[in-house]
Amino acid sequence: MMKLAEIQAACGVLCVDLAAVVDNYQTLARHVAPAQCGAVLKANGYGLGAEAIAPALYAANCRIFFVAQLSEGVALRNILSADAMVVLLNGVMPQAMPFCCAQQITPLLNSVDQVMTWLALQEARSQRRPVLIQLDSGMSRLGVTPEQLARLAAIFRQRGWAAPDYIISHLANADRPDHALNVYQHTLLQQAKKAFPTSRYSLANSCGMFLHPAWREDLCRPGVALFGVAQPWFSTPLKPAFTLTLTILRVQDVPVGTPIGYGSTVTTTRPLRIATVSAGYADGIPRNLRPPAGVCWRGVRLPVLGRVCMDSFMVDASAIMPTSGDVVEFIGVSQTLEEVAAACDTIPYEIMARLGARFRRIMQPAEA
């Protein structure tokens, strides 16, 4: 009888090195000190498995965790100690705020109405929850405007509140160090300090942590950097923290003129050896995956042929002699996450966030 792990591995194996995640966190925390270093684990920890990653980071003294949705917050709250703050970046609707209080989950307040509702709710409680407000300094996504934040200062004074615990904003171009908007957004955050001089402030995401030290403020929020995703200009090396391997389902030699895949977008112009691989776009393999990306067999690159299917895709294995059941690397040493993303005209974030539930996930312990 097959074990569940063997059944799941039939699609592919996603191996997460928790020791590397922890090492990256500690490296980043040292880099931004004395600022506090949190951890962004939205989208199931960027597709890798937040419920295993969060406790490992907590053991490494991370005490503030960011997710996007309420369901993600509940999942983390259930496994983290009470002294860990769980913050919802998307905030919540007013009707969900009492539930957040009961669950010790902190929504990031993204409008004046949300701030007013949250303050009123806390004033009726014996134990007040933290107040975190998002400032829209240049994303035009979520948060109060600078003008609204200035008006909120008067409201706080009228209601007897000193200040929000945190005012948080988000850089729109942190991956472009010389972009003028970075300076503009930082300037708006400095102006916010006139209204709330005693609040703590947060601006830097993964890339923002490697801009000028002033951008680090009181709290930094690394996300993909925890998993080794870095820009070439980062001053501190990070460790890749996961690999994804797939399985060859079939190997077939085909003659000239053989159509391959949906839409027959590729027709062979020479005899080829085609290998069919065990995952597809239902598992997060981008449908628009293009050569030179594909898979790697013992370090040899096998480029994709034709369109990725829902549950499989084909590669050119003419240079080797693989067999059905062989394990091939999709993300790892021989084909990096960044190379896969570039071949799909996207970013590493998207590739990670789309990693599917059908993969077997192996968590290598941080103690190893």
UniProtKB/Swiss-Prot annotation:
InterPro entries assigned to the protein according to its UniProt record, in alphabetical order: Ala_racemase, Ala_racemase/Decarboxylase_C, Ala_racemase_C, Ala_racemase_N, Ala_racemase_pyridoxalP-BS, PLP-binding_barrel
Gene (UniProt): alr3
EC nos: 5.1.1.1
Protein known as: Alanine racemase 3
UniProt xrefs under Pfam families: Ala_racemase_C (PF00842), Ala_racemase_N (PF01168)
List of catalytic residues: 42 (proton acceptor), 262 (proton acceptor)
N6-(pyridoxal phosphate)lysine modifications at: 42
Assigned GO CC terms: cytosol
Xref: PROSITE patterns: ALANINE_RACEMASE
Binding, substrate: 141, 310
Lineage of the organism: Bacteria, Pseudomonadati, Pseudomonadota, Gammaproteobacteria, Enterobacterales
Cofactors, names only: pyridoxal 5'-phosphate
A molecular function GO annotation: alanine racemase activity
GO biological process terms on file: D-alanine biosynthetic process
Pathway the protein acts in: Amino-acid biosynthesis; D-alanine biosynthesis; D-alanine from L-alanine: step 1/1
Family statement: Belongs to the alanine racemase family.
Substrates-to-products reaction catalysed: L-alanine = D-alanine
